Amino acid sequence: MIRYIKEDSQYFYVVTERGQTSSMSKNHARLVNSNSRTWTIERWGYAYTYDEKCNLIESHKY
């Protein structure tokens, strides 16, 4: 489960309840939503939802 998401100018960092961290390049994206299981970013008019290990779950027009 996701504990929190932090970000800097280049990366999103997903920290789990077990203390594990996964990272993903921002590449002009912004964080729009997160909960304990998934997180969603918006980039160039599309939304991308990922799990705690930064695996893509779904994408759609935003």
Task: Describe the predicted segments one by one.
Residues 27-32, 36:
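Structured surface patches comprising rigid loops and adjacent beta-strands/short helices at the edges
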Residues 11-27, 49-61:
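Surface-exposed loop/turn elements that mediate protein-protein interactions on large endomembrane-trafficking
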Residues 1-7, 12-14, 35-49:
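Short beta-strand elements that form the blades of beta-propeller/WD-repeat-like
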